[in-house]
Regions:
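Phosphate-ester processing/binding pockets and catalytic centers
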Residues: 1-226
Length: 226
């Protein structure tokens, strides 16, 4: 029987003209048979720290720091993996490539997932719903992936409150975006970023090795096609 993985995908500042310099797509993956354990462990941590509601990068504060600090350690000490791709939006030139921003978005999501799909395994892919267009984007992505793979068991949109791992994806991705934008006003967020960087052994402004599985960070250079 083939091993199955769940991917929990999210995006940050992905709208073309939102005034933000970077577009980030990311996911956390887990072996399916360990999903229940991770959900239970995270919920127990929330209870321990009297944390209510969703984990979000925007929610990190001095009072919530102990919970998020433990959550980062949990991620790096577990079998969970994270991958993100970063696009510098100043390099976007959709007219040159005869595409819309939605077309580009679909292509980037494919690039996010394509490099880590193993034909020997099966996959359930979940995408955080953002708006009414999310369903169409998910359908397009499913079409792209099924063109090259026959092991995508399920691809659907869900709301972040339905998934602890989707929420954790938001936290890790938020740390990357915060660091790249040079923001540093919230001490608790700075400390979380420093903790992630200690685990990774490098700053969040640098790409990781392509073969890195635990925390894979890739900066796409649209000008040079890589």
């Amino acid at each position: 029987m083939s091993k199955t993985y769940n991917f929990y995908c999210d995006e940050s500042t992905h709208i073309e003209n939102d005034g933000q310099p970077f577009m980030i797509l990311s996911y956390i993956s887990t072996p399916y048979h360990l999903l229940k354990m991770h959900n239970q462990n995270i919920r127990e941590m929330k209870i321990k720290h009297f944390y209510r509601g969703e984990m979000k990068w925007s929610s990190i504060s001095k009072s919530q720091y102990p919970f998020y600090n433990e959550m980062i350690d949990y991620f790096f000490n577990s079998d969970l993996n994270f991958r993100a791709i970063v696009i510098d939006k100043s390099q976007l030139d959709h007219k040159l490539h005869n595409q819309s921003h939605n077309d580009f978005y679909d292509k980037m999501y494919y690039q996010l997932l394509n490099k880590k799909i193993n034909p020997e395994f099966n996959y359930n892919i979940y995408i955080d719903i953002k708006d009414t267009h999310s369903y169409l984007k998910a359908r397009n992505l499913k079409t792209y992936l099924e063109r090259d793979y026959n092991n995508i068991r399920n691809l659907q949109v869900i709301r972040s409150y339905e998934s602890e791992l989707m929420q954790l994806t938001d936290v890790l991705m938020g740390a990357i975006n915060y660091k790249l934008r040079g923001l540093n006003k919230v001490t608790a967020k700075n400390n979380i970023i420093e903790k992630i960087e200690r685990h990774c052994g490098k700053p969040l402004t640098q790409k990781t090795d392509k073969a890195e599985n635990k925390f894979n960070l890739f900066f796409i250079d649209l000008k040079n096609g890589n």
